[in-house]
Amino acid sequence: LRMSRGLGDVYKRQEEHISDVLEGNPTPACDVEEATLECMRHPIGSRPLQEIVRKGDKVCIVCADITRTWNHSDQFVIHIVNELNRAEIPDSDICILFAQGTHRAQTPEEDIRVVGKEVASRIKLYQHDCKNKDELVHVGDTKLGTPVWINKHAVDADKVIVVDGITTHLFAGYGGGRKLILPGVAGDESIQINHCNALGTEFGSGINPATRSTLLDHNPVSDDMQEASDMIKPCFLVHSIVNADGQICRMVGGDPYEAWLEGTKLVYRIQKVPMKQEADVGFACAGGYPKDVSLYQGSKCYDPADVAVKDGGIIIAIMEASDIQEPPAYLNSFQYETEADMERALRHHFTIPFFVAFNLFSVSYTHLRAHETCADLV
């Protein structure tokens, strides 16, 4: 199983006690440079990138941060920059804005890990701080009432390109696409109000059932994000898709919505796995670095594991969690004794780390209620 930057072992005593080993469908790795150029020159729902930008444009590449390096953006951002150069956009007219959402600032070494050494040495790099109001511009409100505050580097650019990878997401259905704008380069108020839609409309209803992994239709979190992204009007998208071995197997590019949506369909086909039966015990792998960089990031693996384990069963998560800079809102949220107490506090002051903890708490309570004798073990 993947743990940190390597592999960890789980020892099994008797084969007949193993119900199933669930892995993504085998998909060969691709030639990243070739696939990136192909998706920019023969895009989905869009003209080629070179025909969209023009000499004199100031281009902002909004790029996912260090917590998303599983997307291997360091392997393909260079090809985007060079393609812009071929369209007569010099390095001096290009900047990269890291879509950090509410995450911490990156170190210079982490910047290099995200975009590669050459890009980091050639292109202006900006860190997004969701709480720095001097860096934010109000561009409107969504139909759900979310005030949309966006980083000025994205707002002031002539062209915005969104760069990430696509995988499933805990409550937005899928990551990537519109998430590069909200929450990626949005203000803290915008992010928290948007993410509140992950809860049901009334106290006691818990998590909104429409805001689950792989769900996009009528998902209020995703729809709200898309509306906010449309206010910025990114001109192009370049996203990677990785296989079960963590290698890039596809690149999608083109219209920021249509190309992303096509990418989500590819992800579903690659990651969907058949399951013989629900298990009594499930070992859940967080996916290795950077997905297991912290308890906060790694605990998201409980959600898919919950589907594979019987109510009252046991989920054992395997992760390294080497980054001790856990969000305080995540660690402090486990002080509540009941799910109701936790939900009440979350509705009063919603934060993303708090929600992730609440989701974990809800999963745990589902199993503990069904089999209370597991309490001491858990």
Model-based region annotation:
Residues D292-Y365:
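C-terminal catalytic subdomain
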Residues K58-W70, C95-T102, F283-C285:
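Short glycine-rich or small-residue beta-strand-to-loop segments that form or flank ligand, phosphate
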Residues A105-G175:
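An acidic, phosphate/nucleotide-engaging active-site surface
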Residues G6-Q14, T366-T373:
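Conserved small/polar residues in nucleotide/adenosyl-binding loops
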Residues G206-Y289:
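Membrane-embedded hairpin module used as a gating/binding unit in multi-pass transport
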Residues I150-V155, V160-V238, N243:
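Conserved phosphate- and dinucleotide-binding cores of soluble alpha/beta proteins
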Residues W70-I89, C301-A308:
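Histidine-anchored nucleotide/phosphate-binding helix
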Residues D93-G101, I316-M319, R369:
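Short internal beta-strands
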